[in-house]
C-alpha cells in the first residue's frame, strides 16, 4: 500500500482577478489514508472550497497535482462524491430519483446489470437508514432542511465513492439536527470505509468528526497546522464532554486564533 | 382599516378576532381563503359590468359611444347568424397561433443556446437587443412587399412581434437554473449533454411554459396590427372596419371576446403548469 487514498503534492491555485492575483491555495501537500476523516477549518477565504473543487475535479490546479489511489485526478468521477452547503437536490426529481441520479448516469455508460441492481438496492437501503424511506416519492421542497441534507448525503454516497467531499454541509442546520447528522455521517462512512474531507467553520464539529483537523490561513491559502485527533473511533454525544476532546478543541482554537491575529493587521 | 360596525353584540375578543382575520387578508405573500379570492375576482368583473350597464342603460353616455350589454349580445347573435362571428374567431386564432408557434420553434432553441453558451449569447443577445426596440407595425410595408397579401405576412407580423421578446425571456429563464445544481450534476458524473438535458432543460421548463403563456398574450395584441394588412375577415379586421361604420357594439363584442380568449388560454396554461410541474408550485409544502 504505497499510494494514499487522496494525495496532494505542491497543490497551488491562483485566481487572476483584474490586475491582482489571488493565491487561493499555495503549495499544499497532503496525504490522506483510506477511511480517514480530515476536517478543514480556517477563516473565510483560506482556500477550503478551492481545495474541494480541485479534489472534485470541478477546477484545475495552477500547479501541482492531486491523486486518488495514485491516479491523477482529471475531472469529476464516480470515485468521489460531494455534499454542498446548500443541499443542491434537483427540485424536479423525487428524493429517490435524486439519490439515483448518479446511478442513472453510470447505467448509460456501462451495462453491469447485476452490480447496478446491487447499487439500486444500496440506494434504497441508505434511504431507509437515514429515515427518508417514507419520503422517497416526495419532492425536495416538501422536506425539511435536515431531511434535504440527508438526501444530499445519500445521493453522494449512492455510487459508493472512495472519497466524500463535504463543504460546510451542516452549516444551515439547527444544533440538534446537526448533532444527529454528524453521528449519522460517521456511521455511514465507517460502514463503507469512505475517506472524508469535511470543511466546517465549527471547531467542535471538526474535532468530533475528524481523525485529523487541518487549520488553514488565507492570503495565501496554506495549511498551518495538522492536529491529530486521538480519540476513540466510535464517537457519540458523550465524546464532546470528555476532557481529551476539549483539550484537542483548545489546541485547534489556539491555532485558529493565531491565524486570525496574524491575518488581521495585513488586512 | 376602520372596524365595521356590524358586530356590536359580539365580545371584545370576537371583534379582535374579526379584525385579525381581516388584517390577514392583506398580509404580504400569504395565502387567503379560496372563497375570498374567488369572490374578489368575480366581484371585480361584476362591478365593472354593473358600471357598464348603468352607464349604457341609464344613457349617461350616448349609445354610439357606449353600447348596452344587450345591444352587444344582439350583435353577437346577428353576426353568428350571418356566419361571420365563428369565421372571424377561427381565422384570427389560426393567424395568432401560427405566428406564435413559429416564434416558439425559433425562440426556444435560440434562447437555450444564448442562455448557456457564451459564443451564442455573443451572437444572439446584442442582435435581439438591436431588434427589440424596432416598431413592429413598421415592418408591414416590407412584409407586403416580400410576402404578398395572403396569410403569410399576417402570420409573419405576429411572429416578428413575439419572437424577439420570447428569445430574450427564454434566455433569462435558462440562465436562472442555479450554477450549484450544474456543479452537483458534474460531480455526479454528468457530461455536457447530460447536464443540458437533465438539469438545464428540466430546470428551465416551468419558466419556459410561463414565458409562452405571457407571450401568447403579446401575440394577440399584434392581431389588430397584423390584420391591417389587406384582410377581409378576422377579429382585428372586424374591429377596424366597425370603426368606419360606427358599430361600437361590434367593437365591444370583439374586444370582449379577445379578453375572454385571453382568460381561457391563461387558465389552460396555468392548469398545464400545475399538472406538468408539481414540484415548482408555490406553497407545495403545507
Ligand atoms: N472563481 C474565483 N475567482 C476569483 N477568485 C476566487 C474564485 N474562487 C475563489 N476565489 C478566491 O480564492 C480565495 C479562497 O476562496 P475559497 O472559496 O476557497 O475560500 P473558503 O476557505 O472556502 O472561504 P469560506 O469559508 O468563506 O467558504 C478567496 O480569496 C476567493 O476570493
Ligand atoms: Mg467556502
Question: Which sequence ranges carry the predicted segments?
Answer:
Chain A
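Helix-to-loop junction immediately C-terminal to a conserved catalytic motif
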Residues: 56
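A short, proline-enriched helix->beta-strand linker immediately N-terminal to the Walker B motif
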Residues: 158-162
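Conserved ABC ATPase signature
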Residues: 139-143, 147
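Conserved ABC ATPase "signature" region
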Residues: 104-107, 111-135, 187
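Short helical segment in ABC ATPase nucleotide-binding domains corresponding to the A-loop/adjacent helical element
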Residues: 96-105, 120, 228
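Conserved ABC transporter NBD signature motif
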Residues: 64-76
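The feature captures the beta-strand-to-loop junction immediately N-terminal to the Walker
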Residues: 41-43
Amino acid at each position: 500500500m504505497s499510494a494514499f487514498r487522496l494525495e496532494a503534492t505542491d497543490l497551488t491555485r491562483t485566481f487572476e482577478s483584474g490586475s491582482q492575483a489571488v493565491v487561493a491555495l499555495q503549495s499544499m501537500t497532503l496525504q490522506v489514508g483510506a477511511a480517514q476523516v480530515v476536517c478543514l477549518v480556517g477563516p473565510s477565504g483560506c482556500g477550503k472550497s478551492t481545495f474541494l473543487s480541485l479534489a472534485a475535479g470541478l477546477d484545475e490546479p495552477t500547479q501541482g497535482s492531486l491523486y486518488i489511489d495514485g491516479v491523477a485526478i482529471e475531472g469529476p468521477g464516480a470515485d468521489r462524491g460531494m455534499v454542498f452547503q446548500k443541499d443542491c437536490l434537483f427540485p424536479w426529481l423525487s428524493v429517490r430519483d435524486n439519490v439515483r441520479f448518479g446511478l442513472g448516469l453510470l447505467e448509460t455508460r456501462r451495462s453491469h446489470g447485476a452490480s447496478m441492481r446491487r447499487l439500486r438496492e444500496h440506494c434504497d437501503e441508505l434511504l431507509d437508514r437515514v429515515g427518508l424511506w417514507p419520503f422517497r416519492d416526495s419532492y425536495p421542497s416538501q422536506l425539511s432542511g435536515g431531511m434535504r441534507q440527508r438526501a444530499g448525503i445519500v445521493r453522494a454516497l449512492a455510487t459508493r465513492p472512495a472519497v466524500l467531499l463535504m463543504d460546510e454541509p451542516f452549516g444551515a442546520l439547527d444544533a440538534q439536527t446537526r448533532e444527529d447528522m454528524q453521528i449519522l455521517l460517521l456511521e455511514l462512512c465507517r460502514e463503507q470505509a469512505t475517506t472524508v474531507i469535511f470543511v466546517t467553520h465549527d471547531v467542535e464539529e471538526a474535532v468530533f468528526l475528524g481523525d485529523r483537523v487541518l487549520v488553514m490561513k488565507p492570503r495565501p491559502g496554506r495549511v498551518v497546522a495538522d492536529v491529530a485527533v486521538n480519540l476513540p473511533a466510535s464517537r457519540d454525544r458523550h465524546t464532546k464532554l470528555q476532557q481529551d476532546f476539549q483539550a484537542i478543541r483548545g489546541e485547534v482554537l489556539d491555532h485558529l486564533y493565531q491565524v486570525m491575529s496574524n491575518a488581521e493587521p495585513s488586512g | 382599516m376602520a372596524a365595521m360596525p356590524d358586530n356590536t353584540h359580539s365580545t371584545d375578543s370576537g371583534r379582535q378576532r374579526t379584525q385579525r382575520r381581516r388584517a390577514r387578508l392583506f398580509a404580504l405573500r400569504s395565502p387567503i381563503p379560496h372563497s375570498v379570492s374567488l369572490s374578489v375576482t368575480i366581484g371585480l368583473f361584476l362591478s365593472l359590468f354593473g358600471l357598464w350597464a348603468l352607464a349604457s342603460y341609464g344613457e349617461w353616455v350616448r349609445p354610439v359611444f357606449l353600447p348596452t350589454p344587450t345591444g352587444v349580445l344582439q350583435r353577437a347573435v346577428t353576426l353568428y347568424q350571418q356566419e361571420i362571428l365563428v369565421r372571424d374567431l377561427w381565422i384570427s386564432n389560426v393567424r395568432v397561433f401560427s405566428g406564435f408557434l413559429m416564434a416558439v420553434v425559433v425562440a426556444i432553441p435560440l434562447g437555450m443556446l444564448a442562455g448557456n453558451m457564451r459564443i451564442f449569447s455573443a451572437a444572439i443577445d446584442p442582435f435581439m437587443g438591436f431588434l427589440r426596440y424596432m416598431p413592429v407595425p413598421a415592418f408591414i410595408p416590407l412584409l407586403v412587399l416580400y410576402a404578398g397579401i395572403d396569410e403569410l405576412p399576417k402570420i409573419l407580423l405576429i411572429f416578428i412581434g413575439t419572437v424577439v421578446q420570447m428569445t430574450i425571456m427564454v434566455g433569462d429563464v435558462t440562465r436562472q437554473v442555479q450554477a450549484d445544481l450544474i456543479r452537483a450534476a458534474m460531480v455526479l458524473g454528468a457530461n455536457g449533454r447530460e447536464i443540458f438535458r437533465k438539469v438545464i432543460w428540466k430546470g428551465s421548463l416551468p419558466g419556459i411554459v410561463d414565458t409562452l403563456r405571457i407571450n401568447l398574450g403579446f401575440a394577440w395584441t399584434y392581431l389588430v396590427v397584423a390584420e391591417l394588412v389587406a384582410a377581409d375577415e378576422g377579429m382585428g379586421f372586424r374591429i377596424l372596419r366597425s370603426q368606419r361604420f360606427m358599430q361600437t357594439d361590434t367593437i365591444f363584442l370583439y374586444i370582449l371576446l379577445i379578453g375572454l380568449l385571453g382568460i381561457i388560454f391563461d387558465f389552460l396554461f396555468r392548469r398545464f403548469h400545475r399538472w406538468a410541474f408539481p414540484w415548482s408550485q408555490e406553497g407545495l409544502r403545507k
